[in-house]
């Protein structure tokens, strides 16, 4: 019985050591959180490229620590520090007892310790800004296209759009301005997420350019949207259409108007890139 107990204890002890040595990677853990289904996983190769990180150090506080946390360098350094602390614990105690005044001077020169929750918040902000840049690249567009095909961003609530898939976007590229919006390629309108778990997501983590780049990259989607019938709802009372000049008549109807003649299409093409001459 004693030998069996020793064998069982050795097995459990080895399994505990393996579990303690393993840790979850930060990026997959962040993207798998509840309410983060709109995010895609950014490869570490993209983050390690200094060109892709240009000017982000000026926008995110504690940039270096946040970047190390995203790349899982923080977890590795913590494990090394724990091992060093166990080995050198006795030596540090002896030095502190012998050199109290010298240690006080060292403590004053050391940088203040930052709370881990602050670093975690900075890492989330940094990853969101990196994510906004990554989804404009070819691999990022492909990753977002898979989510688009699976309708992970939802469908347009407008009846005449016939369940068109939506695209996430932001009203500003600056953090803290607006939450995420959903763009419909069919009616070209913006909507709030229907689920409350997405209402607090930062819009800058997808940026203002993503829907336009997405539609230009996937030409078949743009052509499909152009082939769809452009119908708009008309108010009627007992089958009679309400006059546009009536008090209860339709407003801002021009927002859903589309070119119908060749002249209208030429004017539309000019307005897309320049102001037409009056």
UniProtKB/Swiss-Prot annotation:
One of its GO terms (cellular component) is nucleolus. GO terms for molecular function: protein kinase regulator activity; protein serine/threonine kinase inhibitor activity. InterPro entries: Casein_kin_II_reg-sub_N, Casein_kinase_II_beta-like, Casein_kinase_II_reg-sub. The keyword Acetylation applies. Residues 78-94 have a biased composition (Acidic residues). SMART domains: CK_II_beta (SM01085). The keyword Secreted does not apply. GO terms for biological process: DNA damage response; maturation of SSU-rRNA; nucleolar large rRNA transcription by RNA polymerase I; regulation of cell cycle; regulation of ribosomal protein gene transcription by RNA polymerase II; regulation of transcription by RNA polymerase I; regulation of transcription by RNA polymerase III; ribosomal small subunit assembly. Belongs to the casein kinase 2 subunit beta family. Disulfide bonds: none annotated. Residues 1-22, 78-111 are annotated as: Disordered. The modification N-acetylserine is found at residue 2. Tetramer composed of an alpha subunit, an alpha' subunit, one beta subunit and one beta' subunit. Interacts with FACT subunits POB3 and SPT16. interacts with YTA7. It comes from Saccharomyces cerevisiae (strain ATCC 204508 / S288c). This is Casein kinase II subunit beta. Present with 8120 molecules/cell in log phase SD medium. The gene is CKB1.
């Amino acid at each position: 019985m004693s030998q069996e107990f020793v064998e069982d204890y050795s097995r459990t002890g080895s399994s505990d050591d393996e579990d303690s040595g393993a840790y979850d990677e930060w990026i997959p853990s962040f993207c798998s959180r509840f309410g983060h289904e709109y995010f895609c996983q950014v490869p570490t190769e993209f983050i390690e490229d200094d060109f892709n990180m240009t000017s982000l150090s000026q926008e995110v506080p504690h940039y270096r620590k946040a970047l190390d946390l995203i790349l899982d360098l923080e977890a590795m350094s913590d494990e090394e520090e724990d091992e060093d602390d166990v080995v050198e614990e006795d030596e540090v105690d002896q030095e502190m007892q012998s050199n109290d005044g010298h240690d006080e001077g060292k403590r004053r020169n050391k940088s203040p310790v930052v709370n881990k929750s602050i670093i975690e918040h900075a890492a989330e902000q940094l990853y969101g800004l990196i994510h906004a840049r990554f989804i404009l690249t070819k691999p990022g567009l492909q990753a977002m296209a898979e989510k688009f095909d699976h309708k992970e961003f939802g469908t347009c609530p407008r009846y005449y759009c016939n369940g068109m898939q939506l695209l996430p976007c932001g009203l500003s590229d600056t953090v803290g301005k607006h939450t995420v919006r959903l763009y419909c390629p069919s009616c070209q309108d913006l909507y709030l997420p229907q689920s409350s778990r997405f209402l607090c997501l930062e819009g800058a983590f997808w940026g203002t350019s993503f829907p336009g780049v997405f539609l230009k990259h996937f030409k078949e989607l743009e052509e499909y949207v152009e082939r769809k019938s452009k119908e708009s709802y008309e108010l009627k009372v007992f089958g009679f259409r309400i006059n546009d000049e009536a008090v209860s008549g339709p407003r801002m109807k021009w927002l859903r108007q589309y070119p119908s003649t060749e002249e209208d299409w030429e004017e539309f093409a000019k307005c897309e890139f320049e102001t037409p001459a009056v």
